[in-house]
């Protein structure tokens, strides 16, 4: 039997590098909403394509924005 060919995953482009964003601020709600699901959960970095350091900064900024009521803790809910 022939060995199955492995597909190489397509590398994700970093959305922060593409938009030339260097500073992640908790007051930039429009940017932070791109990294939150419709349920209000923080998206994983394998989904968003950011680096480990950027993911940490994004997560901290989202948590700070939630604390000062700029972002909700949860999404719209079930219905």
From Swiss-Prot:
UniProt GO cellular component terms: cytosolic small ribosomal subunit
Name this protein carries in UniProt: Small ribosomal subunit protein bS18
Function: Binds as a heterodimer with protein bS6 to the central domain of the 16S rRNA, where it helps stabilize the platform of the 30S subunit.
Pfam families reported for this sequence: Ribosomal_S18
Species of provenance: Arthrobacter sp. (strain FB24)
UniProt entry keywords in alphabetical sequence: Ribonucleoprotein, Ribosomal protein, RNA-binding, rRNA-binding
Description of how the protein assembles with itself and partners: Part of the 30S ribosomal subunit. Forms a tight heterodimer with protein bS6.
Family from the record: Belongs to the bacterial ribosomal protein bS18 family.
């Amino acid at each position: 039997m022939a060995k199955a060919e492995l597909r190489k995953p397509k590398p994700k482009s970093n959305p922060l590098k593409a938009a030339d964003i260097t500073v992640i601020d908790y007051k930039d709600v429009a940017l932070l909403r791109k990294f939150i699901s419709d349920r209000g959960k923080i998206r994983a970095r394998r989904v968003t394509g950011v680096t480990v350091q950027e993911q940490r900064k994004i997560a901290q900024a989202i948590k700070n924005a939630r604390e000062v009521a700029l972002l909700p803790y949860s999404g719209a809910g079930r219905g």
